[in-house]
């Protein structure tokens, strides 16, 4: 009888131990989360904030705390952007945070006109302070390191696109990546076209920025680029309305009036011949390619169509252009656009 009792006790103990082992295994190495969760750990975050954001989504919180203490996570977690996937275990989550196994984020740069806008756009998508990024963009030293003369010229290095970065990328890392993208863009057969056009990279980018602000119609961009190339070659001021808006920093200006044309600025192409000192926006790749493959014609004027369809009427003579301009102005008046 005693032997049977002892045997039962041993079996019960074995079952309990096995159950405990299985439970422990499941808690540490089993599925700890039921849905995907993105975790952003900033450089300023403390361990408590990290754990507090994770705990509500964890099935095995005690196991997480125990394993995190065992690995010293409190003193050594890495900042970054982490994606906690369904099916991940406590062990995998803790190790991910300790080793800094980040998931890159997608950073989109588009429709940017000024360094201030660019720094704000970057700061919204990466763990970078706006003021710190703007300081880098305005640094003459950084401009020279990137191969440019001035911070204004440095702005021509940035190309609109979507890039992958680690969320914790520093301003310096961001700049080096953008320089590589810039060199890659131009080395893809575009430098050869530059030589044929007689423009430098900076000049082509600056002209492309004007073309981009004039139209979003990619099929019309080469023709508009051709107008400006003709004006440059003939020594005629570009008289580009978007440069007035940039000079005045009034990007919502809907109608350029005579009083605006005298605004004192090196970016005002009504009072200054040639190109502005630097781009007036971040032009699209299509606008850059339109400058490199500009349409050869003899137009030197263009004016928005009164149909407001985004396209333009082109002219070879001032009288033709004035007729187009009067038709457009009449439509502006009819629509009460001032």
PLM regions and their residue ranges:
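Conserved catalytic or metal-liganding residues and their short signature motifs at active sites
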Residues: 1-239, 244-249, 265, 281-286, ...
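Short acidic/His-enriched helical or mixed secondary-structure segments at domain edges of catalytic enzymes
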Residues: 250-257
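His/Glu-based metal-binding/catalytic segments typifying zinc-dependent metallopeptidases
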Residues: 260-272
